[in-house]
Amino acid sequence: MASKASGGSTRNGRDSISKRLGVKRYDGQFVKAGNIIVRQRGTRIYPGKNVGMGSDYTLFALKDGYVYFETRRKKKFVSVLSPEEWEKVMAQKNGKVH
């Protein structure tokens, strides 16, 4: 005779492994060609200048330069700018147009 009623089995107890998605290189960071900038599901962020997109929507640098995030027409874009372009963009942002 059992001294205790058997407990019911649970339907929980599973967990999927994390996919490590998200931004890997942030605005203003220097990247080398081939560096992954964003891992994503679908096009949450679109590739801009000097940025390629993999079959899994991963965005990566095509050239060495600085990461630049911007919003155009309600869409987010990420570009890789050369040091000269980066200086120009930062000057415009800070109101120091030559």
Curated annotation (Swiss-Prot):
GO terms for cellular component: cytosolic large ribosomal subunit. PROSITE patterns: RIBOSOMAL_L27. The keyword Transmembrane helix does not apply. Pfam families: Ribosomal_L27. Residues 1-20 are annotated as: Disordered. It comes from the Bacteria. InterPro entries: Ribosomal_bL27, Ribosomal_bL27_CS. One of its GO terms (molecular function) is structural constituent of ribosome. Residues 1-11 have a biased composition (Polar residues). GO terms for biological process: assembly of large subunit precursor of preribosome; ribosomal large subunit assembly; translation. Keywords: Ribonucleoprotein, Ribosomal protein. PANTHER family: LARGE RIBOSOMAL SUBUNIT PROTEIN BL27M (PTHR15893:SF0), RIBOSOMAL PROTEIN L27 (PTHR15893). Belongs to the bacterial ribosomal protein bL27 family. HAMAP family: Ribosomal_bL27 (MF_00539). This is Large ribosomal subunit protein bL27. It comes from Aquifex aeolicus (strain VF5).
